[in-house]
Amino acid sequence: MVLTDDELKYIEEVLGRKPNELELGMMDVMFSEHCSYKSSKPILRNFPTDGPDVILGPGDDAGIVSLTDEYALAIGMESHNHPSAVEPYGGAGTGIGGIVRDIISMGAKPVVLLDALRFGHMSNQRSKYIFDYVVKGISDYGNRIGVPTVGGEIEFDDNFQYNPMVNVVCAGLVKKDEIVYGSAPIVGDVYLLMGGTTGRDGIHGVTFASEELTSNSEVEDRPAVQVADPFTKKRVMEATYELLETLDIHGVKDLGGGGLTCCLSEMADKGGNGSLIDLNKIPLREENMTPYEIMLSESQERMVFAIDSSDVEKAFEICKKHDLAHAIIGNIIDKREFIIKDDEEEICHAPNILFTEAPIIEREAKEPEKIIEDVEIPEVDVEEALYKLLSSENITSKEWVYSQYDHEVQLRTIVKPGDDAAVIKVDDETSFTIGTDCNSTHVLLNPYDGAASAVLESINNAISMGARPIALVDCLNFGNPEKPEVFWQFKEAVSGMSDVAGKFNTPFISGNVSFYNETEGVTVNPSPIVGTVGVVENTKIKTMTLKDDGDVILVVGNTYPELDGSQYYKHIHNVVQGYPPKIRLEENYNVSTTIEKLIPKYNDNITSVHDISKGGLIIALALMSIKSKKGVNVNISNIPSTTELSQDDKLYSESNSRFIITVKEDALTTIEEALSKNNVAYSVIGSVCSDGFKISNDNDVLVDCSVEKITKENTTTIEKQMA
């Protein structure tokens, strides 16, 4: 039980009595950090949530943003970290299942999945096992329900050895006049429970997710992990679409964390009403289940609909057609109370407030002591460092992962995995871009700048595809919030994210907080994962693929001596300390928005775009060459900067808001004038060629190799480890 003594006292004061066993279990679930956001809610209020394209912000199963006159996008992001640590295949699969149901609940048809993952190093057998089976769980579930998994990102670090991060995004298209919400607004309506039956799996799933893991969690907490059932999910999806098309559905919500307790209490309370539930009507999978088990079960593939009683017969016909369990389990009442009956006996009778408004906890925040050692960074051969970086776990190609995903089902995927973001077709004129980002090492070193940079990087990835960024989603993964140092990280991260999102007018429309990502004193690197939705005309889509020999290569944006936290320091010199790249908000905004405006204006003359991030300029250039199977001839002597740079700074710095763009040679003057007019620093550094990857600094040739060589270094690491 996660209820504190103060919370128990509060419950008794509101009830005027002690809660019975069922009520106590239900409130324990709803007071959990996972359901109540009792630690994070005051901090999350700093996020901007309104914008010109926002239809629905945070608070429902998903956020909704406008894409075209006809279509909107429902999008959500969730974590399934604890379950995936205990049972990686099932934990990852049910994570996908839950976020897909969230999108269906809004009336939308899921068209895309992404995953943002964190693991320990593959040299550790347990981390390797978790990595393998998380990917299999995501792949099997997504492929079987026919929703493409089109992207995401992965990091490997020792701090994720015991606590992997499994964050999943789903987005779906919905016509604006067909949106439904997770509320029960009409007194007298009945609750239709449809889908899978209710069993004993997943009981205490949310309280399990609101505590630290231990060395015994793999055995002790396995029953708290839900059982995935993608085949039932497919039928649930089809039945839901038919119910929404056939009946006047007043509200829909999926049964995720907290099961029936969470679903019914939230639906009724959002509608300003209450619920009267008949426990005996709930379809069960197992015999002799107690009321406690029934109300706390998190069995998968279940949905609740608020419908008019006159539509029950039609609803039942649809459920039977799809061979799904179904029942009317109660009705909506005009008192804001949650009442459950077992036969004629009332076994729960409490006000909604005890399920939907847990008291806020004011957590202490304390900046941890920062220790920086004097470390000598020896000079290394640039070409050898390039090969090591390209083959390092965090930069190597993730094709082994995304090749297991069906990313072309539904035939909407225009730009496939491996670019700055995925591009998904809406109609003949419009597409949307979607991607996720976070550099967990940068957030560890400075949560404000690191988290702000995650938002900026995600926005820049959308811009690199030619899109206009319109909205953000997030999943905030941190350690134990009861520890002041962890809560300080959380507050600083949210502050940085809010500042960047506000500046770019890209509101957060949906998100999730995952605390207690710790195991016996080992805390994960703080990981606020950010996803950005962008809108792009189909004729204006850009990619990082180099196009024609002779195209001119420009670096746009200033580089600073910012190597702390870089992949170069981490993987070449085994150094992780100091201060990560800073946010220079006005400068970053000017560079990014200038590129955003130039791409559609000079669409035919700008031939490729890629933002510079992990690994710095040299890695960005290498990945463009690998992607396109074309070469580059570049000199880094005059890359833009406001300060003196070392050779390492020029090659490996991970400063924010920098882009590589290639332009047609006869358009160079026009592009240069446009950049200068907007006071954006840039430099012409070279040109595209048919083969050869050559990097020079003044007269010194630093790298001179074939594209085939760098491709080989970049594409075999995971395959070798997982063989």
Swiss-Prot record:
ATP binds at Y37, D474, G511. One of its GO terms (biological process) is 'de novo' IMP biosynthetic process. The active site is at H34, H80 (proton acceptor). InterPro entries: PRibForGlyAmidine_synth_PurL, PurL_linker, PurM-like_C_dom, PurM-like_C_sf, PurM-like_N, PurM-like_N_sf. It is found in: Cytoplasm. Its EC number is 6.3.5.3. Pathway: Purine metabolism; IMP biosynthesis via de novo pathway; 5-amino-1-(5-phospho-D-ribosyl)imidazole from N(2)-formyl-N(1)-(5-phospho-D-ribosyl)glycinamide: step 1/2. It comes from the Archaea. It catalyses: N(2)-formyl-N(1)-(5-phospho-beta-D-ribosyl)glycinamide + L-glutamine + ATP + H2O = 2-formamido-N(1)-(5-O-phospho-beta-D-ribosyl)acetamidine + L-glutamate + ADP + phosphate + H(+). Keywords: ATP-binding, Cytoplasm, Ligase, Magnesium, Metal-binding, Nucleotide-binding, Purine biosynthesis. Pfam families: AIRS, AIRS_C, FGAR-AT_linker. Mg(2+) 1 binds at E78, N512. GO terms for molecular function: ATP binding; magnesium ion binding; phosphoribosylformylglycinamidine synthase activity. Substrate binds at S79, H80, N81, H82, R101, Q226, E298, S299, Q300, S514. GO terms for cellular component: cytoplasm. Mg(2+) 2 binds at D102, D254. Monomer. Part of the FGAM synthase complex composed of 1 PurL, 1 PurQ and 2 PurS subunits. Belongs to the FGAMS family. Part of the phosphoribosylformylglycinamidine synthase complex involved in the purines biosynthetic pathway. Catalyzes the ATP-dependent conversion of formylglycinamide ribonucleotide (FGAR) and glutamine to yield formylglycinamidine ribonucleotide (FGAM) and glutamate. The FGAM synthase complex is composed of three subunits. PurQ produces an ammonia molecule by converting glutamine to glutamate. PurL transfers the ammonia molecule to FGAR to form FGAM in an ATP-dependent manner. This is Phosphoribosylformylglycinamidine synthase subunit PurL. The gene is purL.
